[in-house]
């Protein structure tokens, strides 16, 4: 206890008084009151001065309209919740709709047409104003997954834009402050890529609650922390990784709120003697006394558990865990929350989101540190501004505690980067630097399982760390990918632009040029690419000449290389004979025999690797029997517009299937 108070005091002295208005958004659940006493919590038990925004979870949906989950919520909990604003006039309250148990089917039905979305939006404006809420939070887990069709990814965007438009219109007509709009989103990369257009979400929402927790749990076969701040070499999932992933995909940093869980995830150990991080486990530990959910302990239940448990600190992840017998819990405490809050400030994110306020030690009954010990430290570090600042140490993530972590001692290999060349580091780290790294002084490479710990540093230096990962790709080839570990850096984070496949090396120069090992591909402008041994030249924007062949564009529809016919449908899909060419927007092209897929300007996939691209329009031209006619097979028609109009026309939300098929049939007849 003494160590904690001393440490927190030092953190408060270091807290920068930078004048930045951080958000501290706290969820409150409508089932918190149903827990046994003394864990039963009502809105009246909350401190209205701790959080800048309170979100009531959850409302429901019926017949494409927002509704209360039950009569008690509407008649008792809503009024109590919004009455907190009488004590703190600056407090904002929002109502969240959805949640994990809500599923996806009602969202899908509501999103499916413009008419059903308009019905929902009309009910939302009326419902929020009637009950005194200041905004809506969308908790849709997840568009395009868990039974939700992939079209929901784009219909969800339409809903958000239409909600924003309706909120602005209502504010103008009533002369009241505009209703706020937020969303809870995943922190897992494959879900982010599938479910969201990050750039457009970032433009439309007032703030984004990143669920940077539930990264590990009893559904896995070994122990892992629920919400580590930083990644381990063999496991990139972490709060920092999730936040940087969203930022690097185009979300404004000041709208991104990092998720802080006021709970832990538990495991049942396979062997009592193997009790560290990544120890073998078999399902969840026993349910908590009050939450009664296997694999889960609220923070106040964690406090009771650790009184008789062995506690440890995870180096490089800045979070604690504890075990007792065969029961293991990875949790957060005031110290780990402090590290995470300082990370939010250091990286200039928008603030913190807490799930949930009612799982903190609300009355100070369990943990002995007063009421709301977790949220209180976030309030001190992010909201209050009366503490003077002193400079932070250059590497402040170095608190010595009882620590543990996999891997060996640090084995750094450093190469200087020049300012005018792309530097490929020597074998040993199998790492490479791309143009995006040139803003940094050094790139450090380490072997798998190693850590980088800056030592003896007395003056500011900036490092980026590249880590080798191996995975099996199609065709029994080994794929080596390189990840940049943002947790070891002191400056802005960057994303990986370059990967190696098999024995080849690919170097990305900006977003334009790719070099696979043994071949050189050069982009001329934005339209022309030169693979090794061939030259492809763009004449204007319409005509392409590969080495030895001539390709002529007739209008915008057809291109004829020597002896073959290529058809362009709109601006989206190009189909040469026997090959499939897929264009996502203007970014992704698949030449025959190889796949080069660029998603936005973030990732490059060399030959031999699987690439999952959503919302593609793919067409294949093939010979049919002995006839010389060419049949076109339509595989998918799901390319949405990159930009969404203020009032999108329902006819423009997807390609017109009938017209496209008619064009295809006409082409087949012309042969």
Curated annotation (Swiss-Prot):
Residues 1-21 form the signal peptide. Residues 22-385 form the GH18 domain. GO terms for cellular component: extracellular region; transport vesicle. Oviduct. InterPro entries: Chitinase_II/V-like_cat (IPR011583), Chitinase_insertion_sf (IPR029070), Glyco_hydro18_cat (IPR001223), Glycoside_hydrolase_SF (IPR017853), Glycosyl_Hydrlase_18 (IPR050314). The keyword Hydrolase does not apply. It is found in: Cytoplasmic vesicle, Secretory vesicle. GO terms for molecular function: chitin binding; chitinase activity. Chitin binds at residues 71-72, 98-101, 142, 211-214, 355. Disulfide bonds join 26-51. Glycans are attached at residues 402, 511, 526, 541, 556, 571, 586. Keywords: Cytoplasmic vesicle, Disulfide bond, Fertilization, Glycoprotein, Repeat, Signal. Its main location: cytoplasm. Pfam families: Glyco_hydro_18. Residues 490-609 are annotated as: 8 X 15 AA tandem repeats. It comes from the Eukaryota. Highly O-glycosylated and also N-glycosylated. The keyword Magnesium does not apply. Sequence repeats lie at residues 490-504, 505-519, 520-534, 535-549, 550-564, 565-579, 580-594, 595-609. One of its GO terms (biological process) is chitin catabolic process. Binds to oocyte zona pellucida in vivo. May play a role in the fertilization process and/or early embryonic development. Might act as a protective secretion influencing the first steps of the reproductive process necessary for the normal triggering of fertilization and early embryonic development. Belongs to the glycosyl hydrolase 18 family. PANTHER family: CHITINASE, OVIDUCT-SPECIFIC GLYCOPROTEIN. This is Oviduct-specific glycoprotein. It comes from Mesocricetus auratus. The gene is OVGP1.
């Amino acid at each position: 206890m003494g160590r904690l108070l001393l440490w927190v005091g030092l953190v408060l002295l270091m807290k920068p008084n930078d004048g930045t208005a951080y958000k501290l958004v706290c969820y409150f659940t409508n089932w918190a009151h149903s827990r046994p006493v003394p864990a039963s919590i009502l809105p009246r038990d909350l401190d209205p001065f701790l959080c800048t925004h309170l979100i009531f979870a959850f409302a429901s949906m019926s017949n494409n309209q927002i509704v209360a989950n039950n009569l008690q919520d509407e008649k008792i909990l809503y009024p109590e919740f919004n009455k907190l604003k009488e004590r703190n006039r600056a407090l904002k309250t929002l109502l969240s709709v959805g949640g994990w148990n809500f599923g996806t089917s009602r969202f899908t039905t509501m999103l499916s047409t413009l008419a059903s979305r308009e019905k929902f939006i009309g009910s939302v404006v009326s419902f929020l104003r009637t009950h005194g809420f200041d905004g809506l939070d969308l908790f849709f887990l997840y568009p395009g997954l868990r039974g939700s069709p992939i079209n929901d990814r784009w219909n969800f965007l339409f809903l958000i834009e239409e909600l924003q438009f309706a909120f602005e219109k209502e504010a103008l007509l009533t002369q009241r402050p505009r209703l706020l709009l937020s969303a809870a989103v995943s922190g897992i990369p494959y879900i982010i890529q599938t479910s969201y257009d990050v750039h457009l979400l970032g433009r439309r929402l007032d703030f984004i609650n990143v669920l940077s927790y539930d990264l590990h749990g009893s559904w896995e076969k070994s122990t892992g922390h629920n919400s580590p701040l930083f990644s381990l070499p063999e496991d990139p999932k972490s709060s920092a990784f999730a936040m940087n992933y969203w930022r690097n995909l185009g979300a404004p940093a000041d709208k991104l709120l990092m998720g802080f869980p006021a709970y832990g995830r538990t495991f049942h150990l396979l062997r009592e003697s193997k009790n560290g991080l990544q120890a073998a486990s078999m399902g969840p530990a026993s349910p908590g006394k009050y939450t009664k959910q296997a694999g889960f302990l609220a923070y106040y239940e964690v406090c009771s558990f650790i009184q008789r448990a062995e506690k440890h600190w995870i180096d490089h992840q800045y979070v604690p865990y504890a075990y007792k017998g065969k029961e293991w819990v990875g949790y957060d405490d005031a110290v780990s929350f402090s590290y995470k809050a300082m990370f939010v400030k250091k990286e200039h994110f928008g603030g913190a989101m807490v799930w949930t306020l009612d799982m903190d030690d609300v009355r100070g009954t369990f943990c002995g540190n007063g009421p709301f010990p977790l949220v209180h430290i976030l309030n001190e570090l992010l909201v209050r501004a009366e503490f003077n600042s002193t400079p932070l140490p250059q590497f402040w993530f170095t608190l010595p505690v009882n620590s543990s972590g996999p891997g060996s001692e640090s084995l750094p290999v450093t190469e200087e980067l020049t300012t005018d060349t792309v530097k490929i580091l020597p074998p040993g780290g199998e790492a490479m630097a791309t143009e995006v790294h040139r803003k940094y002084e050094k790139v450090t490479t380490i072997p798998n399982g190693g850590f980088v710990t800056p030592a003896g540093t007395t003056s500011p230096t900036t490092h980026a760390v590249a880590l080798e990962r191996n995975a099996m790709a199609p065709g029994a080839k080994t794929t080596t990918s390189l990840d940049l570990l943002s947790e070891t850096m002191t400056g802005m984070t960057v994303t990986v632009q370059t990967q190696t496949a098999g024995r080849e090396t690919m170097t990305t120069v900006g977003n334009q040029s790719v070099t696979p090992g043994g071949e050189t591909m050069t982009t001329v402008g934005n339209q022309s690419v030169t693979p090794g041994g061939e030259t492809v030249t763009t004449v204007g924007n319409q005509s392409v000449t590969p080495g030895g062949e001539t390709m002529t564009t007739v209008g915008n529809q057809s291109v004829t290389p020597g002896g073959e016919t290529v058809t362009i449908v709109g601006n989206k899909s190009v189909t040469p004979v026997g090959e499939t060419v897929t264009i996502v927007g203007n970014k992704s092209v698949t030449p025959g025999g190889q796949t080069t897929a660029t998603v936005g300007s973030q990732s490059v996939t060399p030959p031999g690797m699987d690439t999952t691209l959503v919302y593609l329009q793919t067409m294949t031209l093939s010979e049919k029997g002995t006839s010389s006619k060419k049949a076109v097979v339509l595989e998918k028609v799901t390319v949405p517009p990159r930009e969404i109009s203020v009032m999108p026309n329902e006819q423009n939300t997807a390609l017109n299937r009938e017209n496209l098929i008619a064009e295809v049939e006409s082409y087949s007849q012309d042969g």
